[in-house]
Amino acid sequence: MLRFILLLLFLPFFATAQTTRIDSIFKNAGEVYFSFEVNSKEELNSISKIISLDHGSILPKVFAYANKRTFMHFLALNIPYTLEASPGSKFTDLNMLLSLEAKQLNNWDFYPSYDVYVEMMYAFEDQYPDLCKVTSIGNTVDGRELLVAKLTDSLTVAQNEPKVLYTSSMHGDEISGFVLSLRLIDFLLKNYESDPEIRSILNNVELWINPLANPDGTYRNNNNSIFNASRYNANWIDLNRNYPDPEDGPHPDGNPYQPETIAFMNFTDSVGFDLSSNFHSGAVVANYPWDTWSNITADVDWWLQVMTQYASLAQQNSFNDYFSQFENGITNGNEWYEVAGGRQDYMNYFEHCREFTLELSDDKTPIGANLPFYWEANKASLLAYIQQSVFGLRGVVTDSLTGEPLSAKVFIENYDIDNSEVYSHLPIGNYHRYLSSGVYSLTFSADEYVSKTFNNVSVLNNETTYLDVQLVKHNLTTRELTTQLKIYPQPAGDFVFVAGIPEQANNVHLIDATGARVRSFKLKDSSIVLTKRNMSSGQYHFVYYVNGVQYSKSFIFE
């Protein structure tokens, strides 16, 4: 009894001491880098739901990041840990470029200050106005710009071309891809007139490049230095755990969607990308879906082919041990370690875009003198991946009578799973389906149109199969659903669940009280999560079509 009383007396002291230690740890930064040991991958995956695992970890020793809230959750597990120096503070000879006029852009052995980065991006547009358009897709927590460069020979007129996205450094301390992306823009623009391969790329592909997805993390201290850059954004949130997740749903990290996350979701929604890659560092590997679960993607054979091509070219253009940490230089994401809320899975599942995660360097922030190596090693691979966008199955879907382009679902029978189907994009009606060699049966469907199936469609690796499709329009009737569809909770707050969608349903739409279409959704499965993002309170109608019949059900967002 006396021991129990003494324990009660000392508990407040221990709690106060731990709080004081935590406050001390987070005194100068909102994130901490630390290590600990685990005995199994299952235990590691469980812990990954709490903190951000560092992808360079090799069991049993694990490295990780946490903010103050998630670190306290980790401490509750009573796992011994060691505080480590942050990767962003490893090197000091980073060679910062503080003036664009101070150096010729030849060796690219420097990191630009934030102001020089912005100046460089807009200088590309000024120097090549017919090939490059720079756009700010939004602002960070601290007000810095999220810049993307659109590269194509047709900047203002939509064409029947695949749309490809390269984006780097959503983790602010992983910046080998930052300068690599800038150099890729420069290389493509400078060589367009003289190099037939480059000219073919920009004449046949709409390429978008975002060199820096988390400038607040990269320039954490000030705009003139990347030393001690942080993984997280200015709210100390891991942006690569902040996206809707196929398995864990909206807000898998328990945080609001960050300004950077919202900007990228809106951007990718508006463009409709077909192919993408997300650049990181801290390891060297090409990481393909899925990250969140162990499900094998429908396109695993295609992924293995394309990822092996990327890694093999990188090995050929570097010294022997580059891209050799994993077998053939590639890995399945979940087989490596589990990630919920990642950008890669969001793009594949919700945007129907083929995206992989590219880990470029063991050092998250390499010294400036080493940056040219990563360019020479990856240049051919980056170009080859862009060129993959014109291969596979592609075509245009139109109305059989008017020739009007359609937004249609392209579904491969006995093949597509986990949202692997793709959709044709307006205003052209073009679709791009990447497949390994084989023979396929495809069904094309669109709202208000009769579905059409094509059997025995042959596709070959690194070649293009063209299939244009005309769909016949239905005569429509409308029915109000009363019991088939369930929408809850009602009234809804930040999100609402819709369940009971028939398997045969085509695209679904959200209509406001005025009858205007405010959002279109690509059918995932029998249920869907609608978020209130950027919508006002009021009545809405959930609408979809089955065999030409329109069904709708009303609900309210508070």
Language-model segments: residues:
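A short, amphipathic beta-strand motif
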Residues: 393-400, 429, 469
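Bacterial Sec-dependent N-terminal signal peptides
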Residues: 1-26
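Short, acidic Ser/Thr/Gly-rich low-complexity loop/linker segments typical of extracellular
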Residues: 404-436
